[in-house]
Regions:
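Primarily short, surface-exposed interaction patches in extracytoplasmic proteins
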Residues: 125-199, 204-487, 522-523, 543-601, ...
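Short beta-alpha junctions and helix-cap segments that line functional grooves
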Residues: 2, 85-89, 293
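Extracytoplasmic soluble-region selector
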Residues: 9-139, 143
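A short, compositionally biased
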Residues: 50-54, 94-98, 323-325, 331-334, ...
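Extracytoplasmic
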Residues: 51, 69, 304, 362, ...
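Catalytic cores of secreted or luminal carbohydrate-active enzymes
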Residues: 4-25, 530-538, 542-548
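Long, His/Glu/Asp-enriched segments that create or flank divalent metal/ion-associated functional microenvironments
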Residues: 480-489, 494-497, 501, 507-513, ...
């Protein structure tokens, strides 16, 4: 709808010329557009109202190229910071970032726009660097003229590191010991200690169980399948196997799904198109669904790419075994995916890569070797981005599983470096976590300064994150010294260890635990809402656990003073002692005639567990 062009435009002239010639079809040998390049690759616009002309060139299948700037369609992701005119001119607005997508023919590309404040006297502080991560973060902050916040204090760091790395809270004694330690290496030492805890494995097995959709599904996938799959995954992380080898085992799995649980990847999902979509979203961070019915409007992928990549999954065979819960996965050696348009067979082709030789081979093994290797530029970056998002609260590409040209990384150089180091380091998962946690970027305070208070994408300060459902239930149980019981697990097992995505409680559901119905990262809900607040205030989880665990009663029976109990509650829950003001106000309630100290301190315990400081990692 609406007016596309007027009678005096070049587009009008071309259309009239074509119609006058009888509206001929293009000859069969007409060169096709195979690539699109935009210049500049990044534009920095200082102050509002500054303009920058873009140039777009198309490359054709016959080796020629031409300027297509005026024929290209431009779309800005943030027109408040950078507008793009129809003829390819950028105009800056308020400080911020934008990505301008450029689309010509069936190809999409784009450029990053940084609209920075007019501050010629800006000086970046002389900040030390913890490692290469800080180098890349600082380089970006210098460009956008943002000053990073300072480092968090030791109390904040130990709580943050415990929650992020192992999903637990530090014991009160551990907090006091850590704070009292004057060694300059104590934070790095703590990170190493936590990486060697069994809870680290449990955290990442849970996250990968979500990606791999480990859940029962009536008769198609029963609890024995789920627990064998889950335990196989746990064994891989316990051995710290290179993550690329784990993925290659999953994609190339064959044999019985009981004897080789990795094969359950092909028992949970049997539709070959859906398998391809899941594999690209999990292992490459890409959502290919759009390209099934039409060329992706916001990315480079075409329908040809979609069906060619899906053809790697076209020859998977499945048959029953003596146990009807198990399937035998094998290579049928025949069968192809056909393009929905024209019903033609698309030879298996790597995304953005070549057409490999698959004759006489298991196509999945060919795919596995490429996908989880250095030859695939998307794999290592995707894993690095996924881990980064866990520790930083958002990905360098966000959402983490929506990588596309029109959703670029906020810091491409940082993401590239993380991916390269992961690959060169043998896909050592722990080393990646170690690098992130030892950076000053991870260790910053959540307190903002004047320059970064509006920034949310450049990691100039730490983010405040609500603790995810399983971890929140676990730490409530931890500090109240109570236990939970989940299906198939012993009494006292943590919520992080739940095998089946179908197993849940009202608490876990309310706080956004993933059901594992899809591979989408959006299944884990971290946004706070009214239902959560009401359940904490009025539900039986916090209320019953405070009393059931008997923390306060036992402490008073051990002859601890109310003042000591208050300190211990704060240290156990918040990893800090109360401030002098907090302590004075709380002690005023102790010794009341009409209430026992036990009741007063239990009320305090309940209040702490309902506080934002407890529920959020900061």
């Amino acid at each position: 709808g609406g007016k596309s062009f007027d009678e005096k435009s070049w587009m009008y002239d071309i259309l009239i010329e074509w119609l006058t010639a009888g509206a001929p079809k293009d000859p069969p040998n007409t060169p096709k557009v195979i690539d699109l390049e935009i210049y500049p690759k990044q534009a920095v616009l200082e102050g509002p109202g500054v303009s920058q002309r873009l140039t777009v060139r198309a490359k054709y299948s016959d080796g020629t190229d031409r300027d297509v700037t005026r024929e290209t369609v431009y779309i800005s992701s943030n027109s408040m910071s950078a507008k793009a005119t129809a003829d390819g001119v950028l105009v800056s607005g308020q400080p911020g970032e934008a990505f301008v997508m450029a689309r010509f023919d069936q190809i999409t590309t784009g450029t990053q726009i940084l609209a920075i404040p007019n501050m010629p006297d800006f000086k970046f502080p002389n900040e030390p660097e913890g490692n290469y991560i800080d180098t890349h973060v600082y380089n970006k902050l210098k460009k956008v003229r943002i000053t990073p916040s300072g480092l968090c204090d030791d109390n904040t760091f130990i709580r943050r590191a415990y929650l992020d790395i192992i999903g637990k809270l530090p014991e009160a004694a551990a907090v006091e010991k850590f704070v009292a330690d004057n060694a300059s290496t104590k934070r790095a030492k703590l990170v190493d200690e936590l990486l060697n805890r069994p809870e680290f494995v449990k955290m990442w097995v849970m996250k990968w169980a979500e990606l791999l959709q480990i859940r029962t599904d009536n008769n198609a996938f029963q609890y024995k399948n789920a627990i064998l799959y889950f335990e196989w995954l746990r064994a891989q992380f316990e051995k710290n196997r290179p993550i690329n080898e784990i993925v290659q085992d999953l994609l190339g799995a064959k044999g019985g799904t009981f004897s080789n649980p990795a094969g359950n990847f092909y028992q949970i999902q049997t539709d070959q198109l859906k398998l391809m979509e899941n594999a690209t979203q999990i292992f490459m961070g890409m959502r290919m669904q759009c390209a099934q019915c039409h060329n992706h409007p916001f990315d480079r992928w075409t329908m040809d790419d979609y069906y060619a990549f899906a053809n790697f999954f076209s020859q998977i065979g499945r048959k029953g075994s003596e146990d009807n819960r198990e399937r035998i996965i094998y290579n049928r050696g025949s069968g192809d995916v056909r393009h929905v348009v024209g019903n033609k067979i698309m030879p298996p082709k790597f995304l953005g890569g070549e057409v490999p030789d698959v004759k006489g081979k298991d196509r999945r093994e060919v795919l596995a070797k490429w996908l989880a290797s250095d030859d695939n530029p998307f794999f290592a970056r995707n894993i690095a981005n996924m881990v980064w998002a866990h520790f930083m609260g958002m990905g360098i590409v966000e959402p983490v599983d929506d990588v596309r040209i029109s959703n670029p990384p906020s810091n491409p150089e940082l993401l590239e470096e993380l991916g390269k180091r992961l690959a060169k380091g043998g896909y050592d998962f722990k080393q990646l976590v170690r690098d992130i946690c030892n950076s000053r970027t991870y260790q910053r305070t959540v307190q903002s300064n004047e320059s970064n208070k509006a920034d949310s994408t450049n990691f100039a300060k730490a983010s405040i994150r609500r603790v995810r459902a399983e971890v929140l239930l676990d730490i409530i149980s931890q500090v109240t010294n109570t236990q939970n019981k989940f299906r198939g697990l012993p009494n006292g097992a943590s919520a992080v260890e739940i095998v089946d995505g179908r197993t849940s409680t009202f608490f876990l559901t309310t706080f956004g635990r993933a059901t594992r119905d899809t591979v989408c990262s959006c299944e884990v809900a971290l946004e706070p809402n009214l239902s959560q607040a009401l359940h904490l205030l009025n539900g039986d989880t916090v209320n019953s656990k405070c009393v059931q665990g008997g923390f306060v009663k036992k402490a008073l029976e051990a002859k601890k003073t109310p003042s000591q109990v208050i300190d211990e509650l704060y240290l156990s829950c918040l990893a800090r002692k109360p401030t002098a003001t907090e302590k004075e106000k709380l002690m005023a309630f102790v010794g009341e005639k009409d209430r026992s100290d036990t009741d007063v301190l239990n009320d305090l315990f309940w209040a702490i567990l309902n506080s934002k400081e407890f529920i959020f990692n900061h």
